[in-house]
From Swiss-Prot:
This protein specifically catalyzes the removal of signal peptides from prolipoproteins. GO terms for cellular component: plasma membrane. One of its GO terms (biological process) is proteolysis. NCBIfam families: lspA (TIGR00077). It is a multi-pass membrane protein. PANTHER family: LIPOPROTEIN SIGNAL PEPTIDASE (PTHR33695:SF1). It is found in: Cell inner membrane. It comes from the Bacteria. Its EC number is 3.4.23.36. This is Lipoprotein signal peptidase. It catalyses: Release of signal peptides from bacterial membrane prolipoproteins. Hydrolyzes -Xaa-Yaa-Zaa-|-(S,diacylglyceryl)Cys-, in which Xaa is hydrophobic (preferably Leu), and Yaa (Ala or Ser) and Zaa (Gly or Ala) have small, neutral side chains. Pathway: Protein modification; lipoprotein biosynthesis (signal peptide cleavage).
Length: 164
């Protein structure tokens, strides 16, 4: 059992746990200090806001009738499971892929917790250009998923030594 945690990609799972804790702590702070629908101006291009997203990225399917909550929850569980199995089969030294998978798992579980507990995801990071364009509000879990996805793509471009 210990070799599974130290000799495989699962040794990187600490990063998923860190992403989950950071995400949930940030969301809790936002929910306690900023009323829903309100925000705090931090810089001319960045606000902290308290908004809900019942859909996925960019509020995809947010207007659906509630079934999307369970669809996205199921996807998060399946994807996290598949990536955890891949990490268990990978050597610990495959650092970029294991790093990427851990970030995706952490982000997926962070948003899964919101969907199960609240019925929606709490978003709070709001970047904008003047008042002309607001990027969709997002959270720490979304950042972890996005960074993980970028690392997965980068890992695909890295030449691997042939198996002998």
């Amino acid at each position: 059992m210990m070799s599974l945690l130290t000799g495989t990609g699962l040794r990187w799972m600490w990063l998923a746990v860190f992403a989950i804790v950071l995400d949930q702590a940030a969301k809790l702070a936002i929910m306690q200090h900023i009323p829903y629908g309100h925000g705090v101006v931090i810089t001319p291009f960045f606000n902290l806001v308290h908004v809900y997203n019942t859909g996925a990225a960019f509020s995809f399917l947010a207007d659906a009738e509630g079934w999307q909550r369970w669809l996205f929850s199921g996807l998060a569980i399946v994807i996290s499971g598949v990536l955890a199995v891949a990490m268990a089969k990978a050597p610990a030294k495959c650092s970029l892929s294991n790093l990427a998978y851990s970030l995706v798992i952490g982000g997926a579980i962070g948003n899964l917790i919101d969907r199960v507990v609240y019925g929606h995801v709490v978003d709070f990071l709001d970047f904008h250009w003047q008042d002309l364009y607001h990027f969709a509000a997002f959270n720490v879990a979304d950042m972890a998923i996005s960074c993980g996805a970028v690392f997965i793509i980068l890992d695909g471009f890295i030449k691997k030594p042939a198996d002998k």
